[in-house]
């Protein structure tokens, strides 16, 4: 009887220990899951996405005429009578005369469809990458900030590049009455699915450094201004930071955009070879046949487009973030 009682007591003790271990394991699992969920939720902020979406739509719409003139100027060598677009004011007059005021906004609908999501994804992913690379106290090095910007650029352009191809064809080649559906069918019919990704490598090489430099310039200027000049800057301050960062970035990286547009717009039958085989080949041929200055064709309207675009983009983004955070 004594032995049986002792065995029963031992079994009860073992069961209690097992229950304690199970509770401890469940507690640990719950804590780990909660920590992972919390970390994930702190990395990704929906406010970044929606603020970026609004900023992209507004800024692109306001600068649509300059965007069209810039692209026409970049690819004038491909177009018949393309030289009529090589000066800003005359280009405005030509477009209005031939197509009316609406011609200045040709392709803007698809431009918005592309610019809105691209801006949303870029700000959303940049916020996540930046928080991922930040120190516990919130500080972040210049290198990590550039990495976050470059990564956000790659993600955004990879997901929206087909829209960029469609937008460029509507803006430059397609007739005024062309629809997104018709242009999409035409690209697929003539070039296949690969046609929607023509120029993607150049696009990534373009946007990755642009986003890296643009975000880094913007946040550095903002940070240093608040640290040494104005601790409480006015509401319009983001537009000034954005204008400066956009101008600096454009000057450094503009040639990549020219090459990307040239590659995207070269047309050829299936029995013919393309004008440019790849990104490097395009740079060599452009500089050899047209000179280095060809890589900067359209930079003046580009300044007039990019500087206001980046300026408005950051201004609207910061304003939207402030409004969302107050709710």
UniProtKB/Swiss-Prot annotation:
Question: Per UniProt, what is the membrane topology?
Answer: Multi-pass membrane protein
Keyword annotations for this protein, in alphabetical order, are: Membrane, Mitochondrion, Mitochondrion inner membrane, Repeat, Transmembrane, Transmembrane helix, Transport
Protein's name in the database: Mitochondrial substrate carrier family protein A
- Which sequence ranges are marked TM in the entry? 49-66, 107-127, 146-166, 193-213, 239-259, 304-324
State the family it belongs to. Belongs to the mitochondrial carrier (TC 2.A.29) family.
Disordered as annotated region, ranges: 1-36
Per the record, ranges on the Mitochondrial matrix side are 67-106, 167-192, 260-303
Q: Name one GO molecular function term.
A: nucleotide transmembrane transporter activity
Query: Record keywords: DNA-binding included?
Result: no
Pfam families tied to this protein: Mito_carr (PF00153)
Q: Where does the source fall among the domains of life?
A: Eukaryota
Set out the biological process GO terms recorded for this chain's protein: adenine nucleotide transport
Q: Solcar repeats: which residues?
A: 43-132, 140-224, 233-323
* Gene from which the chain derives: mcfA
Localization: Mitochondrion inner membrane
Source taxonomy lineage? Eukaryota, Amoebozoa, Evosea, Eumycetozoa, Dictyostelia
Q: Which residues lie on this side of the membrane: Mitochondrial intermembrane?
A: 1-48, 128-145, 214-238, 325-327
- One Gene Ontology cellular component annotation? mitochondrial inner membrane
Q: What does this protein do?
A: Calcium-dependent mitochondrial solute carrier. Mitochondrial solute carriers shuttle metabolites, nucleotides, and cofactors through the mitochondrial inner membrane.
